[in-house]
C-alpha cells in the first residue's frame, strides 16, 4: 500500500473530520484522481518531439499516456484537425498516491525559486491545478537525455464540496501553500 494512502486512512480522515466539523467519515474529502497534461505544440512540425514527450510523461507517471489530438484546424497555429498536439495521463488508486508522494517530497522542493504554491489555483469546487515549468524537477527524468525543457499541468481532483475543504485536505497532505 502507498505510504500516503495509509497515512490518509489511518490519520488524516479522523483529523479532517474534527477540523472541518463533519458528522460522517464518508463526508471527509479525498483525492479522486490526478491528471497530468503536457502540451506539445511543436509536435506538428517534428514527430520525434512527441516521442520524447511521451517518454518523459511515462517516466513521471509510471503509466502510458494518451496522445491528445487537435479538435479543429487553426491556420494561425499551423495545425490541422486530428494532429497530435499533446499527451495526458490520469492516475488513480495506489499509483496516484505514489505520484503525490513524489510530487510533495521530491519534485516541488526541486523547483527553482520556489516560494510556495498559490492558494488561488482552486476552481471553486475543491479541485487544485498547478503548472510546472520544467519536467526535470522529477527524479525519474535524466537531465542528460532531455531534448528540451517542457512544462506540464497537474490537476488534482478531490471530493471536497468547496475550496476550503480542498485546501484543508491538501494542506494536511503537506502541500506547501503560500501564507
UniProtKB/Swiss-Prot annotation:
<keyword id="KW-0699">rRNA-binding</keyword>
<dbReference type="InterPro" id="IPR022803">
    <property type="entry name" value="Ribosomal_uL5_dom_sf"/>
</dbReference>
<keyword id="KW-0687">Ribonucleoprotein</keyword>
<dbReference type="Pfam" id="PF00673">
    <property type="entry name" value="Ribosomal_L5_C"/>
</dbReference>
<protein>
    <recommendedName>
        <fullName>Large ribosomal subunit protein uL5</fullName>
    </recommendedName>
</protein>
<dbReference type="InterPro" id="IPR020929">
    <property type="entry name" value="Ribosomal_uL5_CS"/>
</dbReference>
<dbReference type="GO" id="GO:1990904">
    <property type="term" value="C:ribonucleoprotein complex"/>
</dbReference>
<keyword id="KW-0689">Ribosomal protein</keyword>
<dbReference type="GO" id="GO:0000049">
    <property type="term" value="F:tRNA binding"/>
</dbReference>
<dbReference type="InterPro" id="IPR020930">
    <property type="entry name" value="Ribosomal_uL5_bac-type"/>
</dbReference>
<dbReference type="GO" id="GO:0019843">
    <property type="term" value="F:rRNA binding"/>
</dbReference>
<dbReference type="InterPro" id="IPR031310">
    <property type="entry name" value="Ribosomal_uL5_N"/>
</dbReference>
<dbReference type="GO" id="GO:0005840">
    <property type="term" value="C:ribosome"/>
</dbReference>
<dbReference type="GO" id="GO:0006412">
    <property type="term" value="P:translation"/>
</dbReference>
<dbReference type="InterPro" id="IPR002132">
    <property type="entry name" value="Ribosomal_uL5"/>
</dbReference>
<dbReference type="Pfam" id="PF00281">
    <property type="entry name" value="Ribosomal_L5"/>
</dbReference>
<comment type="subunit">
    <text>Part of the 50S ribosomal subunit; part of the 5S rRNA/L5/L18/L25 subcomplex. Contacts the 5S rRNA and the P site tRNA. Forms a bridge to the 30S subunit in the 70S ribosome.</text>
</comment>
<dbReference type="InterPro" id="IPR031309">
    <property type="entry name" value="Ribosomal_uL5_C"/>
</dbReference>
<keyword id="KW-0694">RNA-binding</keyword>
<comment type="similarity">
    <text>Belongs to the universal ribosomal protein uL5 family.</text>
</comment>
<keyword id="KW-0820">tRNA-binding</keyword>
<dbReference type="GO" id="GO:0003735">
    <property type="term" value="F:structural constituent of ribosome"/>
</dbReference>
<comment type="function">
    <text>This is one of the proteins that bind and probably mediate the attachment of the 5S RNA into the large ribosomal subunit, where it forms part of the central protuberance. In the 70S ribosome it contacts protein S13 of the 30S subunit (bridge B1b), connecting the 2 subunits; this bridge is implicated in subunit movement. Contacts the P site tRNA; the 5S rRNA and some of its associated proteins might help stabilize positioning of ribosome-bound tRNAs.</text>
</comment>
Amino acid at each position: 500500500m502507498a505510504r500516503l494512502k495509509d497515512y490518509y486512512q489511518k490519520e488524516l480522515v479522523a483529523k479532517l473530520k474534527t477540523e472541518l466539523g463533519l458528522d460522517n467519515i464518508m463526508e471527509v474529502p479525498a483525492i479522486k484522481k490526478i491528471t497530468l497534461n503536457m502540451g506539445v505544440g511543436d509536435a506538428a512540425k517534428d514527430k520525434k518531439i512527441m516521442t520524447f514527450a511521451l517518454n518523459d510523461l511515462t517516466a513521471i507517471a509510471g503509466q502510458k499516456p494518451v496522445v491528445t489530438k487537435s479538435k479543429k484546424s487553426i491556420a494561425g497555429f499551423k495545425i490541422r484537425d486530428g494532429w497530435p498536439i499533446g499527451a495526458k495521463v490520469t492516475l488513480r488508486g495506489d499509483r496516484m498516491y505514489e505520484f503525490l508522494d513524489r510530487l510533495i517530497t521530491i519534485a516541488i522542493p526541486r523547483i527553482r525559486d520556489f516560494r510556495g504554491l498559490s492558494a488561488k489555483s482552486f476552481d471553486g469546487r475543491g479541485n487544485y491545478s498547478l503548472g510546472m515549468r520544467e519536467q526535470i524537477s522529477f527524479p525519474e527524468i535524466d537531465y542528460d537525455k532531455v531534448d528540451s525543457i517542457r512544462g506540464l499541468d497537474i490537476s488534482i481532483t478531490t471530493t471536497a464540496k468547496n475550496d476550503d475543504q480542498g485546501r484543508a485536505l491538501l494542506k494536511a497532505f503537506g502541500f506547501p501553500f503560500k501564507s
